[in-house]
Amino acid sequence: MSEELSQKPSSAQSLSLREGRNRFPFLSLSQREGRFFPSLSLSERDGRKFSFLSMFSFLMPLLEVIKIIIASVASVIFVGFACVTLAGSAAALVVSTPVFIIFSPVLVPATIATVVLATGFTAGGSFGATALGLIMWLVKRRMGVKPKDNPPPAGLPPNSGAGAGGAQSLIKKSKAKSKGGLKAWCKKMLKSKFGGKKGKSGGGKSKFGGKGGKSEGEEGMSSGDEGMSGSEGGMSGGEGGKSKSGKGKLKAKLEKKKGMSGGSESEEGMSGSEGGMSGGGGSKSKSKKSKLKAKLGKKKGMSGGMSGSEEGMSGSEGGMSSGGGSKSKSKKSKLKAKLGKKKSMSGGMSGSEEGMSGSEGGMSGGGGGKSKSRKSKLKANLGKKKCMSGGMSGSEGGMSRSEGGISGGGMSGGSGSKHKIGGGKHGGLGGKFGKKRGMSGSGGGMSGSEGGVSGSEGSMSGGGMSGGSGSKHKIGGGKHGGLRGKFGKKRGMSGSEGGMSGSEGGMSESGMSGSGGGKHKIGGGKHKFGGGKHGGGGGHMAE
């Protein structure tokens, strides 16, 4: 019965399945394709699962172990990768950070700083070298080194470019004005005072009174001052110099006192050589005056020489009208010749003031000279003190014109010192003292060259050659021509040095006025050949 019962449900199930297939044919289809659709056949899938697990049921206890092993291995691998990555990153950071610091933010600023510093050192060194060169150049100039031995620094802008000469000359002019003005003025004032004292001593040694020597010394200073004003004459100096050779013949007949006044007139010849034809007219009129002076006393002759010298200088820039002015004054000098020493001194010094005003006035200076020649008659009545004060004012007038030529102070001192040499009785002693004074005169010339900066303003040549004339026209004024000829040669060399300094300044008038100075001393001196040699030397040096 139990077997039947056990078989009945199975048969019943089979019957039900069959009925179900017949009733629901899609169910049988789904069951048949259950392997293709396991989601639909839950029972079969569960059965197969259990069958697989039952097959690998021995691996089930190892599943957790496998998970632990896989996790541990993976963790170790990832930790290794992380360590390698972090180590590489740390190494890269350690290496790249110094490289970045060194090469990117430091090297570029360091390079820029190096370039800037190198440029700064280079520029600073060049500026420093230029500054040192300028300082040494200025120190050498102050010490009296010649310009050709003391060239300016090569790095200066005036030495490079087209306008080098103009800029350099402007620099020299400005330095000359700032440097030599007070110095030359002090020297001029001192030499004007000491020149009068030397004139007194020279007058004491001479045959005539000391008063004449004093007036003569003041003449030399006034003529030296005015000789600088006429340094613009140029070639016309030759005519003025030649015209004075005629006076030399007349002066050769005069006595020593007249020779001394002739010496002052030879300074007028130097001014005339610079002034042009007006100097010629002045010299001819003075040759007539020299005849009158030969008859007059020394005081009157000296006063005539002074007035003549200053009158000739008043026409230095005036031209031909100044010649007429000098001739008119030659007539008035006859009236002045009758006056005493005080009157002659006052007239002469007033003439010096007139000469300075005429040199500045140009063509109107001739008229000024003529008009003031009338005033000189009134001034002739003044005392000696007034004329001395006039002399000081005249020297100040010369300094007011020192912008035209600073070297007038130094060279006027030279002419003043040399002008007094001829007053000595003994030619040998006079020659020795002449040598010393000639050296002092050359020193005056050097000071003049410092003041004028070697002819930078064009009037250093007049200073140098006036010193030369001052030395040369004393050769004929002495008794012993041999000794004085030698010393005159040295003085002539100092004059030629003045001419050379003027030629360095680029002023051609210095050379030609020097040659004129040499020519007018040929007839004026006793040693005509010596004078000719000196004159030729002056012309050669000036060229």
From Swiss-Prot:
Annotated segments matching region 29 X 4 AA approximate tandem repeats of G-M-S-G: 220-514
Residues covered by region (Disordered): 148-169, 195-543
Annotated Sequence repeat ranges: 220-223, 227-230, 234-237, 259-262, 269-272, 276-279, 301-304, 305-308, 312-315, 319-322, 344-347, 348-351, 355-358, 362-365, 387-390, 391-394, 398-401, 405-408, 410-413, 414-417, 438-441, 445-448, 458-461, 464-467, 468-471, 492-495, 499-502, 506-509, 511-514
PROSITE patterns listed in its UniProt record: OLEOSINS
Comp. bias intervals (Gly residues): 201-212, 230-240, 272-283, 315-326, 358-370, 405-416, 440-470, 495-505, 532-543
Ranges of Low complexity composition bias in the record: 220-229, 345-357
Entries under Pfam families matching the protein: Oleosin
Alphabetical keyword list: Extracellular matrix, Lipid droplet, Membrane, Repeat, Secreted, Transmembrane, Transmembrane helix
Renumbered residue ranges of the record's region Hydrophobic: 68-162
Stretches for region Polar: 1-67
Topology of this chain in the membrane: Multi-pass membrane protein
UniProt record similarity statement: Belongs to the oleosin family.
Protein name: Tapetal oleosin GRP-17
Natural source organism: Arabidopsis thaliana (Mouse-ear cress)
Top-level taxonomy: Eukaryota, Viridiplantae, Streptophyta, Embryophyta, Tracheophyta
Gene transcribed to yield this protein: GRP17
